[in-house]
Amino acid sequence: MNNKMISVNQRDYAWPRQPLVVVCIDGSEPGGEGSDQGGYIERAIDAGQTPFLASLREKATFGYADCVVPSFTNPNNLSIVTGVPPSEHGICGNFYYDTDNDVEVMMNDPSLLRAPTILAEFNQAGAKVAVITAKDKLRRLLGVGLDIAGGSAVCFSSELADQATLSEHGVEGIVDRVGMPVPDVYSAELSEFVFAAGVVLMKSMRPDIMYLSTTDYIQHKHAPGTPVANAFYAMMDQYLTRLDAMGVTIALTADHGMKAKHAPAGEPNVIYLEPLLGEAGLTEFRVILPITDPYVVHHGALGGFATIYLDNDSDHARARAAFDGVPGIETVLTRNEACNVFGLPADRIGDLVVISTRDYVLGSAPEKHDLSGLKDPLRSHGGLSEQRVPFIVNRCLEACATGRRNFDIFSHTLNHALEGSS
């Protein structure tokens, strides 16, 4: 047995005894108390659509954990692969305000990452690593530190799979090998390609560690238990069954949950922050919505978490009071409060943080949001109500401390999986 341990960001990880596949199921709202319509996986199991996941609920590890707040894609994927909160790795949203350069930018550049990843540290210690994402926006961040040129790592997205090259991605011809056309970015097939490619690489490369990250296009459009949602999880179940048959350890979690954010008639429940601040007499401020990314058809840049920059320190109390008693506002925190509670980097967060309740989302101003792409009642995420996520492993785990987080998935699976369990 290999007793080698790898230390990453002050956490120790055992060398995998068999290949480990960690899957981040984007937007996978879980079941249990406070869930939206019973949870995606649970409803699919109850409908008889996912026999493999049903077997894990019966005889393996089937539980829950908390994700990072803001409950968005980038901060949580990077927390999962670094094992630490955003206060340490620096990625606190999909989008942020660069105060040094006075510019609002997508948080996709590898230079923004402040901590090494578990993937890179294992790769540099001799492990073969494969990373497959649905959206290309995550690829460069997740691939930081991987030895692509040395041939021991692969990192590509299904979105741009036809552009994958040996020199930049560690693989070529993957579209032909998978046998699927490059999917549309707004499709279930974008995630299916991730799983299909994962099976192909597990057969040909057999990496020691594989990280698969899907897209939440389906979850934004379809509630748990609906036919389309159940079909999506049935597809995923089939690929997980094939991976399990290859003798790998499979660990599933999510970057965030997903809740309905609309009124009974279907119109979105939006609180626009700029008009409220204006009504309070404020003029010098900047509202940042960290959910912002290029894929506005998913959510219209409307999420449950916003941060506000104020030009004048004297405006703090008045700005905070602007949201008093507003229906749909769950909490308003100062920068220090938010960083202490949620583990966020203080230099990348505004003076105030606003979080909405489970039924509402936050916007900047009506004219700044193009909602024409929202063909279905809005479902979104970002706040405390989407913090609970699945934590599922096809092995039994030793008893672990309470307060489990999604970014504990590597630690718990590598360090606490019971040998021979399945």
Which functions belong to the PLM regions below?
Residues V81-A223, A229, H298, G304, ...:
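His/Asp/Glu-rich, glycine-adjacent segments
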Residues V21-V22, F52, A231-L277, V354:
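Metal-dependent active-site segment of extracytoplasmic phospho-/sulfohydrolases and closely related
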Residues T241, M258-T307:
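Acidic/histidine-rich catalytic neighborhood
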Residues P290-S422:
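Active-site neighborhoods of enzymes that stabilize oxyanions during catalysis
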Residues M1-R17, D244-A245:
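A short acidic-Thr-Gly-centered motif at the start of a beta-strand
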Residues R57, N123, D244-A245:
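Anion (oxyanion) recognition and catalysis
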Residues E33-G83, K128-A130:
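Short, structured active-site-proximal loop/turn typified by the sulfatase FGly-forming signature C/S-X-P-X-R
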Residues P30-G32, T73, H89, K137-G143, ...:
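Short catalytic/ligand-binding loop motif for oxyanion handling, primarily in non-cytosolic enzymes
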